[in-house]
Amino acid sequence: MVERTAVFPAGRHSLYAEHRYSAAIRSGDLLFVSGQVGSREDGTPEPDFQQQVRLAFDNLHATLAAAGCTFDDIIDVTSFHTDPENQFEDIMTVKNEIYSAPPYPNWTAVGVTW
């Protein structure tokens, strides 16, 4: 069996320990990353939606960096949206700043109700 190694970004380990999950798991050459949200360092939600998207990507970046990875290493993204029609522009603005040149990752966006 392949060894699994838990990965945690600096400063947020208590959040994961409290809820009993890992920010990411490295297994062989693969990194499996838990879902990321636009929360502040203390875990509270950011009220401004575009800033919330930025924080989610910042949190993802921190997790990737803790594993020695970058956004260029991502091959597949699944995102969940509570109001896609009104959120799409803000999401695309931030996404396009991060992924500004090919090859782009696969991306599946799913509209959900909460």
Descriptions of predicted regions:
Residues M1-D58, A62-I75, H81-W114:
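N-terminal presequence-like segments and the immediate start of the first folded domain
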